[in-house]
């Protein structure tokens, strides 16, 4: 079961990355569970899909694109989820994912239940 949960969580982050790289803020927000808290340092804290979608739309409108992940580590979190940590780069910035909690939902997909990341610099 754990390997299946991990593969489902990996499919979730892949879907998020594809929607971001397609400049689809609504698609990005759909990868978050309802009521999720996203801590985006240094920008602030955003709660719920509506606020999260607006944040990503603003980032996209500023020309940020082409996100990629490196140094990805997955740690089991309960029986139905994983914690992800990673480094990330975009065309205009780079940073780290401090903690993403990907958890299986009732529809069988994994979505973010918590997201904390940081922009560490410009490129």
Identify the meaning behind each predicted range:
Residues 1-27, 37-123:
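A beta-strand edge to alpha-helix "cap/lid" segment located at domain peripheries
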């Amino acid at each position: 079961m754990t390997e299946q949960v991990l593969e489902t969580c990996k499919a979730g982050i892949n879907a998020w990355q594809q929607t971001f790289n397609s400049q689809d803020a609504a698609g990005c927000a759909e990868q978050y569970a309802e009521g999720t808290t996203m801590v985006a340092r240094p920008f602030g804290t955003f709660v719920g899909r509506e606020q999260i979608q607006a944040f990503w739309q603003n980032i996209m409108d500023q020309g940020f694109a082409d996100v990629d992940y490196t140094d990805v580590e997955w740690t089991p979190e309960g029986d139905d989820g994983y914690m992800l940590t990673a480094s990330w780069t975009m065309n205009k910035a780079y940073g780290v994912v401090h903690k993403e909690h990907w958890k299986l939902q009732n529809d069988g997909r994994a979505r973010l239940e918590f997201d904390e990341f940081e922009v560490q610099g410009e490129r």
